[in-house]
Amino acid sequence: MPHHDQLHRYLFDNLAVRGELVNASATYARILENHDYPAAVRALLGELLVATTLLTATLKFDGDITVQLQGDGPLKLAVINGNHRQEMRGVARLQGDIADGSSLKHMLGNGIMVITITPKEGERYQGVVALEGDTLSNCLEAYFMQSEQLPTRLFMFTGEQDGQPAAAGMLLQILPTQPNNVDDLTHLSHLTTTVTPQELFTLPANEVLYRLYNQEQVTLFEPQPIAFLCGCSRGRSASALMSLPPQQLEELLAERGSIDIHCDYCGSHYLFDRVDIDALRAGAQPDEAGQLH
């Protein structure tokens, strides 16, 4: 399925609107792989992945973007982190039961969406918007109006295809050079509402665009690959341990005999016993393939 896990950008030759189409199904499956989330949380994480991937296309520099949902409901946190290379990871944290079909409001309660853009060079930007919409799409559209004053429409779908998790979506946005030209967006949004999850999950981008916009002149650009990437490593885990006060390390070792660091994103475990800790204190470098001894 070569068209999967790709981000496509496109422009309309005669309309002041830009578009994006993404299928991130394999990446979505990888994010869910080591977790047993309720169905409603799985679906929300898929939408959040699609949304964050679409947002990475707006980055005009090397850097990261994080879209985070947090609230006082049973779903305390849902977050997706991506970068300009469309390398993605994500996780959710729950306290309490979440029924199938639960709405955004039921899951998060009184919540906010925090979008953080961190360039490798320059200042970090953070935007916060209350989760007042019925869907994640509604909340993101409100964010674009609030932060960039650009009317935007999002179409996001999650589900299964051939027994595997599937996540895909589309974005339409008025070009910044013509922010008041809402008629073009309204026209194209009406056409785009006819797209089905099955089409986005299974068809190449050019075929989807032809089915939707065959009366329009569309320029489709080269796709960008999307992939799951977790930045954890034994070395980073060792550095985190060495940042703890020595007394706290001793207490952990005395209590447990060893320290097991678990990565919520990818499910990896990094085990450090007393020999490892003593070697790290002596300046040894952790072996990425295993323990120090």
Curated annotation (Swiss-Prot):
GO terms for biological process: protein refolding. Transmembrane segments: none annotated. The keyword Chaperone applies. Disulfide bonds join C230-C232, C263-C266. Keywords: Chaperone, Cytoplasm, Disulfide bond, Redox-active center, Zinc. GO terms for molecular function: protein folding chaperone; unfolded protein binding. Under oxidizing conditions two disulfide bonds are formed involving the reactive cysteines. Under reducing conditions zinc is bound to the reactive cysteines and the protein is inactive. It is found in: Cytoplasm. InterPro entries: Heat_shock_Hsp33, Heat_shock_Hsp33_C, Heat_shock_Hsp33_N, Hsp33_helix_hairpin_bin_dom_sf. Its main location: cytoplasm. One of its GO terms (cellular component) is cytoplasm. It holds the Pfam family HSP33. The keyword Cytoplasm applies. Belongs to the HSP33 family. Redox regulated molecular chaperone. Protects both thermally unfolding and oxidatively damaged proteins from irreversible aggregation. Plays an important role in the bacterial defense system toward oxidative stress. NCBIfam families: PRK00114.1. HAMAP family: HslO. This is 33 kDa chaperonin. The lineage of its organism: Bacteria, Pseudomonadati, Pseudomonadota, Gammaproteobacteria, Enterobacterales. The gene is hslO.
